[in-house]
Amino acid sequence: MHCLSVFVILLLLTASAPSVDAQPKTEDDVPLSSFHDDLQRTVRTLLDIRMCCLGTSGCCPWG
């Protein structure tokens, strides 16, 4: 029974260890920061359009 508890503890420790990406990066890989930047740019653009629609007549792209 003692061996089982040691095995479970070792299993939990190895499961929580940081994993290493064994595959080399290719040129198709896009860093996550790029997606984050795209999201921020999209939100900023939508907010700019919203403020433009509220402040100026004829500025809103959808009428």
UniProtKB/Swiss-Prot annotation:
Post-translational modification, briefly?
A: Contains 2 disulfide bonds that can be either 'C1-C3, C2-C4' or 'C1-C4, C2-C3', since these disulfide connectivities have been observed for conotoxins with cysteine framework V (for examples, see AC P0DQQ7 and AC P81755).
State a single Gene Ontology molecular function.
toxin activity
For the modification Tryptophan amide, which residues carry it? W62
The cross-references to InterPro entries, in alphabetical order and at most eight, read: T-conotoxin
Provide the primary localization: secreted
Q: Which domain of life is it from?
A: Eukaryota
Leader sequence range is 1-22
What tissues has this protein been observed in?
Expressed by the venom duct.
Please report the propeptide residues according to the UniProt annotation. 23-50
Answer yes or no on keyword Disulfide bond. yes
Q: Which GO terms describe its cellular component?
A: extracellular region
User: What Pfam families does the entry give?
Assistant: Chi-conotoxin
- Which subcellular locations apply to this protein? Secreted
Entry keywords, A to Z:
Amidation, Disulfide bond, Neurotoxin, Secreted, Signal, Toxin
**What family does the Swiss-Prot or TrEMBL record give for this protein?**
Belongs to the conotoxin T superfamily.
Q: What is known of its domains?
A: The cysteine framework is V (CC-CC).
* Protein name stated in the entry: Conotoxin PnMRCL-0111
